[in-house]
């Protein structure tokens, strides 16, 4: 399931969602700054949303409401794409191919199977590629612009890490859906009251059994409205603070809200909860090595043979590993320490070096090993299990703060871009 950090921002790169191919005769649906949204764009996304809803057996609102949601989505996309063009943001064919391959993999399909599925659904593959490229540009522009506005202080990381550490062994994750009833910038009291009344009415409908996904499609101003407001799984600490507080005692099936923020009133549905172990232990290795690099005066084969001779001298007692490293090793970072690499996790090393190291027993020396750096003799001195919970908690705290602030700042940023853009809707 997709992560809510991505879904909250509306990056809907799913294998069965794409715009239909443009029609020969087209009209302008909206003017956005110096660009346009075409009727074919609106009709194409309408087709995709209806197709997805049918496959998911999800009810949709009436066409007028759905069209309004789609128009707002396309207007926002156009605004951000124009920013990307000015910034020179480009997605290479290689990046695009990799993204599409990942989408196919996430949907348990080969690339050919996905192309066949798109064709079966009446969706043009080249048009699909273009839409994924657009979504990637939108994502990059949004991420770059929003992250520039975020500051995370060391004290914040320490405080949240301590909170995480004081929790139970299993930290809670939630699967949420979200509805946003928006407020304009500097709203009047009447506008606030009207939005709050609408939000409370939606909460009442949801608590009385109305389909939350249909309510989201009909009323939500969030970018994921067309996905039924689905945010997916994530930790409670990754949410904006006002959400986390409101969800601290929530149970599966709860409808939470309305919650007031700077951009409007939020309604959340807790689809599910689950726990996750926080104990983190890693194995570190203490190793040393002797490195010989092939050069114009030493061929690759000569370097290997030289290391074999050094290994034989160490085994016979003619020299020690440390002495040989100081005399022969061409690794400037470890030669003077007798080749000692200190304590580290094995995954930081070159793959060939790592694989050879993990096959050694304590006190054992390898045969010559070839890596991207040259030829090595490796000796495993010791291993240990290290509790990395504290470091992991700080790393997690930083990511949680980034995700939380990103969600809050992204909503404000998008509202600002929409308010400052010239938009004229020409059709209804």
UniProtKB/Swiss-Prot annotation:
GO terms for biological process: Gram-negative-bacterium-type cell outer membrane assembly; protein folding; protein stabilization. The PPIase activity resides only in the second parvulin domain. The N-terminal region and the C-terminal tail are necessary and sufficient for the chaperone activity of SurA. The PPIase activity is dispensable for SurA to function as a chaperone. The N-terminal region and the C-terminal tail are also required for porin recognition. This is Chaperone SurA. It comes from the Bacteria. Its main location: periplasm. It catalyses: [protein]-peptidylproline (omega=180) = [protein]-peptidylproline (omega=0). Chaperone involved in the correct folding and assembly of outer membrane proteins. Recognizes specific patterns of aromatic residues and the orientation of their side chains, which are found more frequently in integral outer membrane proteins. May act in both early periplasmic and late outer membrane-associated steps of protein maturation. GO terms for molecular function: peptide binding; peptidyl-prolyl cis-trans isomerase activity; unfolded protein binding. PROSITE patterns: PPIC_PPIASE_1, PPIC_PPIASE_2.
């Amino acid at each position: 399931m997709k992560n809510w950090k991505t879904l909250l921002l509306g990056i809907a790169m799913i294998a069965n969602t794409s715009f239909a191919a443009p029609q020969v005769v087209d009209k302008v649906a909206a003017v956005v700054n110096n660009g346009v949204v075409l009727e074919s764009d609106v009709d194409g996304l309408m087709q995709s949303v209806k197709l997805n809803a049918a496959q998911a057996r999800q009810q949709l609102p009436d066409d007028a409401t759905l069209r309004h949601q789609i128009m707002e989505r396309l207007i926002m996309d156009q605004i951000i794409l124009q920013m990307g063009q000015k910034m020179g943001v480009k997605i290479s064919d290689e990046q695009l191919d990799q993204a599409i391959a990942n989408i196919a993999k996430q949907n348990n399909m080969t690339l050919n199977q996905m192309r066949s599925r798109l064709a079966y659904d009446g969706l043009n593959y080249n048009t699909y590629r273009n839409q994924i490229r657009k979504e990637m540009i939108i994502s990059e522009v949004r991420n770059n612009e929003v992250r520039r506005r975020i500051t995370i202080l060391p004290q914040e990381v320490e405080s949240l890490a301590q909170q995480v550490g004081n929790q139970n062994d299993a930290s809670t994750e939630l699967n949420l859906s979200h509805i946003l009833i928006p407020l304009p910038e500097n709203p009047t009291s009447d506008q606030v009251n009207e939005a709050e009344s609408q939000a409370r009415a939606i909460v009442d409908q949801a608590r009385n059994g109305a389909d939350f996904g249909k309510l989201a499609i009909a009323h939500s101003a969030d970018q994921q409205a067309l996905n039924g407001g689905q945010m997916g799984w994530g930790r409670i600490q990754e949410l904006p603070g006002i959400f986390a507080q409101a969800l601290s005692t929530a149970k599966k099936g709860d409808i939470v809200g309305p919650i007031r923020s700077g951009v409007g009133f939020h309604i959340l549905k807790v689809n599910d909860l689950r726990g996750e172990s926080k104990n983190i232990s890693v194995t570190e290795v203490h190793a040393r090595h002797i490195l010989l690099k092939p050069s114009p005066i030493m061929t690759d084969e000569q370097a290997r043979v030289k290391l074999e001779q050094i290994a034989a001298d160490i085994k016979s007692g003619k020299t020690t590993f440390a002495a040989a490293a100081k005399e022969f090793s061409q690794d400037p970072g470890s030669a003077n320490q007798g080749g000692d690499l200190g304590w580290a996790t094995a995954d930081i090393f070159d793959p060939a070096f790592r694989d050879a190291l993990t096959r050694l027993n304590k006190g054992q020396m390898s045969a010559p090993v070839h890596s991207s750096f040259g030829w090595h003799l490796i000796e495993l001195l010791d291993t240990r299990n290290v509790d990395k919970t504290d470091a992991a908690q700080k790393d997690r705290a930083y990511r949680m703060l980034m995700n939380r602030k990103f969600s809050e700042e992204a909503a404000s940023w998008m509202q600002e871009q929409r308010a400052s853009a010239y938009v004229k809707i020409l059709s209804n």
